[in-house]
Curated annotation (Swiss-Prot):
UniProt KW keywords: Cell membrane, Cell projection, Cytoplasmic vesicle, Disulfide bond, Endosome, Glycoprotein, Ion channel, Ion transport, Isopeptide bond, Membrane, Phosphoprotein, Potassium, Potassium channel, Potassium transport, Synapse, Transmembrane, Transmembrane helix, Transport, Ubl conjugation
Cytoplasmic-facing ranges: 1-20, 157-181, 268-336
Native species: Mus musculus
Taxon lineage: Eukaryota, Metazoa, Chordata, Craniata, Vertebrata
Name of this chain's protein: Potassium channel subfamily K member 1
Positions of glycan attachment: 95
Length: 336
């Protein structure tokens, strides 16, 4: 009897604090994933770093042996200055003198990476005035970019995701959840093909020292806004039509980022993923927890825009992936 009471009380305790338990496991899982990544990266990259260090020491020792008139401190000072300039995107190589980092097209590419928070790091402001302007420009430009992307993604999502799903649901009678899942998978496949595989093949042809894997790596690092900066297109010494190439890359990165956000928004609106996310949200038991700062208690690109714009008609279609009463149509088909 006591055991059954204790068991039932434990079950009630777990159910009462289920959200807290799920959140705790989420934090633990994230920390373990961080540790897992660190272990894998360290085990894979550390041997290559050690080999590179040994190779550089051998080259340096051989160079000093062949040039006895040059002392090691002088060489260290020269190499330090070269590496410092390289961090600012300035190369000492003679065949790299023709590439300017701050002409208009390069500055346009830099501005796009700053506003999208990609930040490759291959080119950075040299002067104090440039650094100060970069701070002010980013403080204003990054929220402006978020507003711009929010508006674009909301409009694109209506035409690319919501209306097609609603059309197949009403016109053909398919389950809205099934249509939404199939549509999300197809949209993801098309996006990966158009903004990853095809551009990677193009970059592997245009960039002399890039293979397909390195090109695909650049596309992923860029469109996910990681922006490590180890691969930056258009920096080759014999790059033809460099200005036009830089403008094309800027357009590709902007369109690719919009496409990625549309796909992300499409998957986030799936009913199954919404239920999964709610497992980790705090349970609103108190009255003060029910007070919404915003009109909708959710954060998504489309919902934010709907709150700002107040588009009630679009708001009716903002939940196309859950079962709801279909709007009446005389012909049994959508009028759009």
């Amino acid at each position: 009897m006591l055991q059954s009471l204790a068991g039932s009380s434990c079950v009630r305790l777990v159910e009462r604090h289920r959200s807290a338990w799920c959140f705790g496991f989420l934090v633990l899982g994230y920390l373990l994933y961080l540790v897992f990544g660190a272990v894998v990266f360290s085990s894979v990259e550390l041997p290559y770093e050690d080999l590179l260090r040994q190779e550089l020491r051998k080259l340096k020792r051989r160079f000093l042996e062949e040039h006895e008139c040059l002392s090691e401190p002088q060489l260290e000072q020269f190499l330090g200055r070269v590496l410092e300039a390289s961090n600012y995107g300035v190369s000492v190589l003679s065949n790299a003198s023709g590439n300017w980092n701050w002409d208009f097209t390069s500055a346009l590419f830099f501005a796009s990476t700053v506003l999208s928070t990609t930040g490759y790091g291959h080119t950075v402001p040299l002067s104090d005035g440039g650094k100060a302007f970069c701070i002010i420009y980013s403080v204003i430009g990054i929220p402006f970019t978020l507003l711009f992307l929010t508006a674009v993604v909301q409009r694109v999502t209506v035409h690319v995701t919501r209306r097609p799903v609603l059309y197949f649901h009403i016109r053909w009678g398919f389950s809205k959840q099934v249509v939404a899942i199939v549509h999300a998978v197809l949209l993801g496949f098309v996006t990966v093909s158009c903004f990853f595989f095809i551009p990677a093949a193009v970059f592997s042809v245009l960039e002399d020292d890039w293979n397909f894997l390195e090109s695909f790596y650049f596309c992923f690092i860029s469109l996910s806004t990681i922006g490590l900066g180890d691969y930056v297109p258009g920096e080759g010494y014999n790059q033809k039509f460099r200005e036009l190439y830089k403008i094309g890359i800027t357009c590709y990165l902007l369109l690719g980022l919009i496409a990625m956000l549309v796909v992300l928004e499409t998957f986030c609106e799936l009913h199954e993923l919404k239920k999964f996310r709610k497992m980790f949200y705090v349970k609103k038991d108190k009255d003060e927890d029910l007070v919404h700062i915003m009109e909708h208690d959710q954060l998504s690109f489309s919902s934010v825009t709907e709150q700002v714009a107040g588009l009630k008609e679009e708001q009716k279609q903002s939940e196309p992936f859950v079962a709801s009463q279909s709007p009446p149509y005389e012909d049994g088909s959508a009028d759009h």
